[in-house]
Amino acid sequence: DVLFVPEFTWLNLLVAVWIAGSVIYISRVMIKYYKAVKALKANVIDGTPEMQAKLDLISQKCGIRRKVKLKITDCVISPVTYGFFNLVILIPNREFDDRDFGYIATHECCHIKNKDIWIKLLTEIYCGIFWWNPFAHLLKKDLTYCLELRCDKRVTSKLSENRCTVYYEVLVTQMKAYKEQKESEKSDRETALKSALVGMSFVTNDKGEKIISRMEMILYPKKKQTIINNVVTALM
């Protein structure tokens, strides 16, 4: 029998490099996720019974049938939701009053209800397939922003103007707390952790126009929307 040896062509080489790059990219995402979840197990505690009970009530109102666990940790500066089957809302180890926690939990439950974590996972796979295309990675960043806007819109859609202002104040308070620690080493660890968890965060590291656009959507929901806001509306 003659051993078949494929003929070398530049096309075959490019396809081989493409496949190898995709396998490496997706493998790294999976490994980072596994390590992040494993590391968190040793650095989290359960939320108080009162906070867990309130989260249970909010998740039920959002139409979530599965149990959403509340965990507290020193590893993050701002709340984050993660988990594909075991749903977890992770909050920083600091005091939250009922008002702030209620709006944060509602926002994070909207992410769960909208399957945003799965959308981010599919986006990671897409970026893994087209790892060589910079536009794929820009799409990932903009999509995360759009998903945050969609949750803000859903949370505030049935709120009065005064309560929208309160939600805005909660968001600003969390952004301020995030900014105060942003330059610290803890912030770098948090950014890496959130990225590894493929999670959704209440506060992101967006700047400038994106922050303004997010605030405008909350405070002026009836104002003529920009192109990106129309995308968010379409996603709903």
Features from the language model and the residues they span:
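Hydrophobic topogenic segments
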Residues: 1-236
